Amino acid sequence: FALIFFAITGVIFLFFMKKDISRELPPFFLPNTGNMGIPICLFAYGSLGMGVAAAISSLVVLLHFTVNIFLASKKFDIKVILKSPSTYAVIIAVSFLYFDLEMPKFVLNTVMLLGYTMIVLILMSLGISLTQMKVFSIKNSLISSVGRVIFGPIIGFILIKIFNLSGYAAGVLLIQSSMPSAILTYLIAHMYSPKEIVDNISSMIVVSTLMSLITIPIVLFIALKYFP
């Protein structure tokens, strides 16, 4: 539901900014729940928070290789979905949950160790990726970024109240809702969209990430205070 409301917000912003709604929509409803969201949720709520954050991130990654590619290329390609490892990872995870299967302890421990290692790697990849991006339009980037890092947590908070969530689940949803635009939206746009669109998305990612350095600590404080 949160991603749907993020998308609606993006459509409204892009409509009034007279932008390409299809190709420039992904950065609005696909936040950086992996590179930034998972480590922050781990810091805030420990392994339980990281588990919920990883589940949200898995859904976002799946949407990257389905909806994001469809919007960027304006065509549906089943081959891309079948080639994506995230598709099979989500299927396996859902199967374990649905059939209430218990993962062998040695496998679980191995996956957990790899998961903690990946947190360091994804933070490094975030920094490297940001150095390769540039800001082409400050005004439009600021307006778009407000839609992501300001309206995002507001929508998350509203959904928490609507669904009466509490504890770490509510906190993780609020934190993940406040994340800046995902870098993967830039990479996919670079493959499928015109240069002008790629430049706009690049600008939004950089500016929203910089803005999040101010907004995330505030959201984190609220999450830990009201959803311990």
What are these regions (language model features)?
Residues 1-228:
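Alpha-helical transmembrane segments of multi-pass small-molecule/ion transporters
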